[in-house]
Amino acid sequence: MIPPADSLLKYDTPVLVSRNTEKRSPTARPLKVTIQQPGPSSTSPQPPKAKLPSTSCVPDPTKQAEEILNAILPPREWVEDTQLWIQQVSSTPSTRMDVVHLQEQLDLKLQQRQARETGICPVRRELYSQCFDELIREVTINCAERGLLLLRVRDEIHMTIAAYQTLYESSVAFGMRKALQAEQGKSDMERKITELETEKRDLERQVNEQKAKCEATEKRESERRQVEEKKHNEEIQFLKRTNQQLKAQLEGIIAPKK
């Protein structure tokens, strides 16, 4: 791990922790650590041992506030050059100037990291979360109850954001499915259009062939009709001439008898 980046949440000075990380229980609390000097032959004095709790039942307000702070805002740990460091949230009360400085730092970091003012912006969300954690820290030091209420507000906000993120991811997945379906439907429609255009050209070719056949048939029938009409006219003329001849012969036979 690398050292954590600068945060709007105020922390105490980092403490070098020496312990066997391989045998550490995964459920061990990072707060209960023993600070030791490297090397057994060091002449520096050993840190004082933790005092046993007094027999009095009255809890220490400062210790209680620190425990609440550590529960709300856990300490952060990192490894640097095979050395484990731990940094707890500061329990120093904040002044009005600290609040003003927090606002200035927030505005400055928003500008430096080029956070977007509108829309979805992970940078803006991260900085606002750090600022809100710092406000929770300041309020918790003065009043633990209000700090716990703000913690509930923060958790509700995180749950709401997580729900919106899940909804957004589901919407994106749904949109992608619909886009793929539309693309598939578009491909099917394009293929169907191509088939219909091919069928249309085939039908047009058949229509043209039938038109050509029809025109040829009409021309042939027209020629045949003309030939038949000419033949019929010749037969009519022949029959008329024959009729005139027979009529003349009949009149020639009948006329002398009178």
From Swiss-Prot:
Q: Name one GO molecular function term.
A: dynein heavy chain binding
For the keyword Cytoplasm, the answer is yes
| One GO CC term on file | axoneme
Regarding tissue, the record states: Predominantly expressed in the testis, also detected at lower levels in several tissues expressing cilia. Strongly expressed in elongating spermatid cells (at protein level).
Q: Does the keyword Coiled coil apply?
A: yes
InterPro entries in UniProt: Axonemal_dynein_light_chain
Pfam family membership, one = Ax_dynein_light
- UniProtKB keywords: Cell projection, Cilium, Coiled coil, Cytoplasm, Dynein, Flagellum, Motor protein
Q: What does this protein do?
A: Involved in sperm flagellum assembly.
What is the protein name given in its UniProt record? Axonemal dynein light intermediate polypeptide 1
- Per the UniProt record, the source organism is Mus musculus
